[in-house]
Amino acid sequence: GVPSAVSKDKSFIYSSPNLKGLENMDLGHLLKDALGIPAFVDRDVNYLLMNDIKNFDLDPDKDKTILGMYLGTGFGNALYVNGKLFSGKHGVAGELGHIPLMGTKGLCGCGNTECCELKCSGKHLQELREEYFPDTCIDDIFTEHGDDPIIREYIDTLAYPISTEITLFDPDYVVMAGGVMIMKDFPMERLIEQIKQRTRHPYPAEDINFIYPKHTQTSGVIGGALAYFASEK
């Protein structure tokens, strides 16, 4: 799994904002040639979502709509509909971190401007720490500054893209994870409150089922295997 936009045939990496060395690389075929076995490449968050669905038994009947929100260095998003990952025409569906957020300034790693990932990401959290809380370790930023207006605005901004996608898909479950969301004292209650406030009422706002997994280093590996077997059916 890679933090990148990957082709429909699970081989070519189109864009990788946070790992530039992977861009425009046919990684799937390179791995196949090197290993002598078929190799499939996909976004890492797709594999994480497949692992989470299995661990929490979220879709035994293969008829659910499940959204994955993974806040790490960037803002990862995965879509699962009726037993399958949804990838769209070109394989790049679910790039929620790269929808425009009006008023956002700066150039995103993807090459666009106004991408919400410029505000909704672990990278931006680190920028806030460096500018406003330079004496605080990043691991303690929510513990020491969770009630600061700067951090509250950061959390509130996260709610906009998440609530937008929930309103669009009316999902059965929304998985909330990633390195930032599992940080010590992350204000999840406030984030959920803001998401519900901004989601369409009465539904889906009044019936959102959030799931909070804890990942290990093998989560994506297992999810990759699950995704492969699901694609072969």
Predicted regions and their residues:
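Short, acidic/small-residue loops that bind anionic groups at enzyme active sites
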Residues: 24-30, 97-101
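Acidic/histidine-rich catalytic cores of soluble enzymes
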Residues: 48-49
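General beta-strand structural signal in soluble alpha/beta enzymes
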Residues: 39-44
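Glycine-rich phosphate-binding loop of actin/hexokinase-like ATP-binding domains
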Residues: 63-119
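ATP-binding/phosphotransfer module of carbohydrate and carboxylate kinases, centering on a glycine-rich
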Residues: 6-12, 29-37, 53-63, 103-107, ...
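Short glycine-rich anion-binding loops that position phosphate/pyrophosphate groups of nucleotides
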Residues: 3-5, 72-74, 180
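A charged helix-plus-loop insertion that forms the helical arch/lid used to bind
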Residues: 10-24
